[in-house]
Amino acid sequence: LSPAVSPTVPPRHMDSVLDILDALESPARGGSPGTAAALGRGLGICSTPGCQAVLGQPPGTPKRPPALTLGQWQLLTELLRHDPATPEMGAVLAPDGSTVALGPLLAGIEAGLRSGGLGRPLPTLDPPADPLLAVTITEALGTSFLLAQGGDNNATALGPGGCWDDVENPQNYTLRGPPSPVPDPVAIGAMDGVVLGARLARGPLPVAELLRGYYGTGNGSEAGRPPSSYRRRDFGALAGQGRLEKEVVAVLGVLRTLSPIPEFLRDVGTQEVAAVARWAAREFSERYVECPAIMPRCLWGARPYRGTPALLRPPLGSVFLHHTLEPAQPCQTFGACARAMRDIQRFHQDTRGWDDIGYSFVVGSDGYLYEGRGWHWVGAHTKGYNTQGFGVGIVGDFTATLPDPDTLALVRDELLPCAVRSGHVWPDFTLHGHRQLGHTDCPGNALFQEIQSWPGFQ
């Protein structure tokens, strides 16, 4: 390669990372399951004092392994060696539509491999803190919430999410608001690091194989729902709010034993640590475990709203349930659900002449909600009632069959309680099927019968 020719850098997609891991782990090329994690630490994924107390000081700066092309090496270096102030720069788009920071993911994988007996054993921390949670989430949470508490009043401790420039060829990710030390991709990478690290602690597997099984592959694969779309449930089972609170206290205790003590801990007493840990665990659990993930408009490829949206005045008193009828088949992957959203929006804008997709939110059978008009814009879903409630459509025709149990639970047990907790809906809200308020069979006989047993139905 002459110096003038820059290498072709693969897109920032999980598939690119899987190709890199395949090459690094190939026994034919001298690799093993621990190769990628060790390389990651050499490149700087574990740069915080707590992470280094668990995984050790980073090895020297690595050179490009012969198994990787120049473009792959450049991508890996950019993803893992970035400014700690911009953690979202280390993120890739996964096949399920989520954006995953590789740092906490790889740290969790290394902690899991080492607890499972591969490589050097992990140290025993004092006070006893869970090493897997420490390197993925608890140090980051404790740090972020202590800084937010000590900072100016509008300092945020979690979020925001963001948008990719191009979902087919993701290169640049931009946050949609003021940054915090734990933006959504870091929270998601941490949850995945905990879920996969816990799996590896039970026995080593090739990391590429594990990730391929977890995320699925390709944007538009029509296979069923990948395990990664259950990360909130699976993380919650491993680290519920009470456990998370206890582990944030423990990891801050470990940081206090280091020399020098990190700046943000210097004048912090035990009661303050306890209060911060409680706050951090509650906020994290509500945002990332108990509430469903919502795919923003930018990720499914929405066209702009035509004109100026009218604003809702929450909290609202009602939720109206619909089925989309077309597409008649539920969508089980991000690719299929994003396509369904674009089709519905096109039909609503071009055929019906509306300003935008009519629903507030649309529910896929892939484990995600898709933002239509969202929490703030008046929808076009339930004629005569659009300012009084949110319209939620489930992709599919539910005249004779029901959505699968996970999709029903997503709406009944996650979306509705979250809408109340976040102040968008009154606690004594009413739930209606579309047919109760207009001449229509929507949301289909099967679904309408099902929701009559749900809280709030009238």
Language-model features: where?
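Active-site acidic/histidine clusters and adjacent loop/turn architecture
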Residues: 313-349
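Basic/polar, cationic surfaces and motifs that engage anionic cell-wall
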Residues: 1-328, 364-458
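Glycine/small-residue-rich phosphate/adenosyl-binding loop
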Residues: 358
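RNase H-like, Mg2+-dependent phosphodiesterase core
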Residues: 354-355
